[in-house]
Amino acid sequence: MNELLLNLVDPLHQWFLGLGDGGVVLWSVLKILLIAVPVIVSVAFYVVWERKLIGWMHVRHGPMYVGMGIFQAFADVFKLLFKEILQPSSSHKAMFIIAPLLTLAPAFAAWSVVPFDAKLVLSNANVGLLYLLAMTSLGVYGIILAGWASNSKYAFLGAMRSAAQVVSYEIAMGFALVGVMIASGSVNLSQIVFAQAGNSGFFDWFLIPLFPLFIVYWVSGVAETNRAPFDVVEGESEIVAGHMVEYSGGAFALFFLAEYANMILVSFLISIFFFGGWLSPIQGWVNADISPWIDWLWKGGWPWLLMKVFFFASAYIWFRASFPRYRYDQIMRLGWKVFIPLTIVWIAVTALMVFYGVIQKGV
């Protein structure tokens, strides 16, 4: 299946290169659109799936009218885009508009180094992991700026909570990825996936030797995206909507889009770092060439990556419907007193496992 897709892309690539420098620029723009447009569409369907799944968990139907509810998210988008963006009279006008853009830009920029397959990646950067850490850290500046520019007590309190929470869990996430870097011997995301390849299927994935780091990264990813049960940044019962309390229309839609794009991104990264990315869980167990349409089941391919992402994206919704919101002090305690010490210890354990050959770096 991967070969079929590449056979369609390569002739198009060569045609653009034949146009000279302008063709190179157009090809770069096209690649950006090939990432941005699917992410935006995925967010729309993700919102529908969230409403549907939570409805089932609440013993309700969820969205069910007008195309089984599929078009509800698109209707919400058009509704928000055509609404007026109201600004408080005492707000900082320029910063008020810049803040949602500053939140959205890193959420989309991070996708440039995410590999969907061995050859399907926008930029196969050798410092992809470091680039991701940098991009995912920048989004909080938009939230802080929104809280300050709104000139609202609720917005400012939400922004301060977000700053403390993101900084706290960014450390734990970074330490967890240090373990992945040690196990794979690379900071290139494609090489991290190749390091999990082998003839033992899912037993070669980093999930097993790095299981504590997987749990830390998963929970920290939920906290990093300000989702339940770590959504004190926009806790409705306390500070209404936090940093977004004064936003409406298209500006609010940008915050919403950035949040859900980050949720999908974290789901991709968990799948790549700990679940073998596009690798098949039965890779090496079956050796047969039948048809490109089904060979990916045991050879691996982007459909496996999407299935893993779907599971973790659905887990976000499960968390929201199942767990009560943590208190702010409980969130800080979990990050600083549990996750950070645990990751430091397991980094040392990972180094020992690599030194003694317990973790093999691919085939």
From Swiss-Prot:
This is NADH-quinone oxidoreductase subunit H. Its main location: membrane. Pfam families: NADHdh. The lineage of its organism: Bacteria, Pseudomonadati, Pseudomonadota, Gammaproteobacteria, Lysobacterales. NDH-1 is composed of 14 different subunits. Subunits NuoA, H, J, K, L, M, N constitute the membrane sector of the complex. It catalyses: a quinone + NADH + 5 H(+)(in) = a quinol + NAD(+) + 4 H(+)(out). Belongs to the complex I subunit 1 family. It comes from the Bacteria. NDH-1 shuttles electrons from NADH, via FMN and iron-sulfur (Fe-S) centers, to quinones in the respiratory chain. The immediate electron acceptor for the enzyme in this species is believed to be ubiquinone. Couples the redox reaction to proton translocation (for every two electrons transferred, four hydrogen ions are translocated across the cytoplasmic membrane), and thus conserves the redox energy in a proton gradient. This subunit may bind ubiquinone. The keyword Cell membrane applies. The gene is nuoH. It is found in: Cell inner membrane. Its EC number is 7.1.1.-.
